[in-house]
Regions:
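Charged catalytic cores and adjacent phosphate/nucleic-acid-binding surfaces used
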Residues: 1-5, 9, 13, 19-26, ...
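Active-site flanking residues adjacent to catalytic metal/cofactor-binding acidic residues
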Residues: 5, 38, 64, 91, ...
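Short helix-capping and hinge/turn segments at secondary-structure transitions, especially at repeat
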Residues: 86-87, 116
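Acidic/Gly/His-enriched mid-domain segments of enzyme catalytic cores or analogous surface patches
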Residues: 87-97
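Divalent metal-dependent hydrolysis catalytic cores, especially in the metallo-beta-lactamase
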Residues: 4, 24-42, 87-89
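Alpha-helix-loop-beta-strand connector modules within alpha/beta enzyme cores
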Residues: 53-61
């Protein structure tokens, strides 16, 4: 399963130029099996995205990107996080915009993964994220962080099984292997080094 785990839709992320239908169209064209909408500090799109997902038969998982005291974190199953069943990722931890956790990755407990490939982050900063991810034994995540059409699906996450519901997605993230993947122009390469 290939899923872009970090996308912004313009209704609740005002810095995005993407509408939900456009995101889904591009994702399908690139062969993605699902997408995640992770708007800034909002899950307001959830009901609309769930209804659209049912209507078109395509998984759309709504999470949230929130700014913590030390940096941005994305989360899915946020209502499950309180029960310790949600999934939390440090997104773009070494991006030079002061919104990443940076070395605080070591201090934040209960993180499940690290965005080791973020489409809006320079490669060297992504490599630093990969080193920390491995040091901490967390899940490696790839995500576009798209705000514009050409970024959708640039980097994604590979899972060995396909899931279609948010609870199953969260369970899969916890229990299955994850690997980042890179769009090549005609398909995806699942990578361990970059």
């Amino acid at each position: 399963m290939l899923v872009d785990m970090h996308l912004h839709e313009c209704t609740y992320s005002t810095d995005s130029f993407l509408h939900l239908e456009e995101i889904v169209s591009i994702a399908r064209q690139k062969g993605l099996d699902a997408i995640c909408i992770t708007d800034h500090d909002s899950m307001g799109l959830r009901e609309r995205a769930e209804a659209y997902s049912r209507e078109i038969g395509y998984p759309i998982f709504v999470g949230v990107e929130f700014f913590s005291l030390w940096g941005d974190i994305t989360a899915w199953g946020i209502d499950l996080v309180r029960e310790k069943d949600g999934f939390c990722v440090s997104c773009h931890p070494f991006r030079s915009n002061n919104r990443g956790l940076r070395e605080h990755l070591r201090d934040v407990h209960d993180l499940d993964g690290v965005e080791v490939l973020n489409g809006s982050t320079p490669l060297e900063e992504n490599r630093t994220a990969l080193r920390f991810c491995r040091e901490l034994g967390l899940k490696a995540i790839g995500a576009s962080d798209a705000h514009v059409p050409e970024q959708v699906g640039k980097y994604v996450t590979w899972l060995p099984e396909t899931v279609t519901t948010l609870p199953d997605f969260v369970t899969a993230l916890h229990t299955l292997e994850t690997r980042p993947a890179i769009w090549t122009g005609s398909g995806y390469d699942v990578v361990t080094e970059f």
